[in-house]
Design a protein with these regions (language model features):
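Small beta-barrel nucleic-acid-binding modules, primarily SNase/OB-fold domains
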Residues: 2-14, 19-156
Length: 156
């Protein structure tokens, strides 16, 4: 067996690392158990011998008070409702990439028994459809429709 010269390894290795780092995150992350709900749109889940932090895709829930930052109205209600829906339950998470630095959470759509939890948060008036550019591959139309329905029903 012939060994590669060091110069060739030194050239190929950085390219390999670059390729691995820039691989897209798989579209489907799989089934996980939700272990923590931080607020109305951020969770921690465990499964497949890993722990992931997930920012619910396509929604924006009220922010909870943190350090010197004041909380927004209905933040605790949104957190409690999300806990009621999915805490300690096995969910399917479909990933759409990573969120911005410094958190780099997986941006994901969470399903429980066929219900898209992200949309359920909007329908119940505890989150709004995200008005920024949605992640690639996420169909934002049902989110905006849920928001319209919630507003007409005066929820949230």
């Amino acid at each position: 067996m012939r060994l590669l010269p060091m110069k060739r390894i030194a050239t190929v290795f950085p390219l390999l690392i670059f390729a691995l780092v820039n691989l897209p995150i798989p579209s489907v992350a799989g089934q996980f158990t939700v272990t923590t709900v931080y607020d109305g749109d951020t969770i921690k889940a465990q499964g497949h011998d890993i722990i992931i932090y997930v920012l619910l895709a396509g929604i924006d829930a009220p922010e909870i008070a943190f350090q010197e930052q004041q909380g927004q109205p209905y933040a605790q209600e949104a957190k409690r409702y999300l806990e009621k829906l999915i805490l300690n339950k096995r969910v399917d998470i479909k990933g759409y990439g990573l969120g911005p630095y410094p958190y780099n959470h997986l941006i994901g759509e969470v399903r429980l028994k066929g219900t898209i939890i992200n949309i359920a948060m909007i329908k119940n008036g505890l989150a709004e459809a995200c008005h920024e550019m949605p992640p690639d591959g996420l169909n934002i139309a049902p989110y905006r429709e849920a928001e319209r329905e919630a507003m007409e029903a005066k929820r949230g």
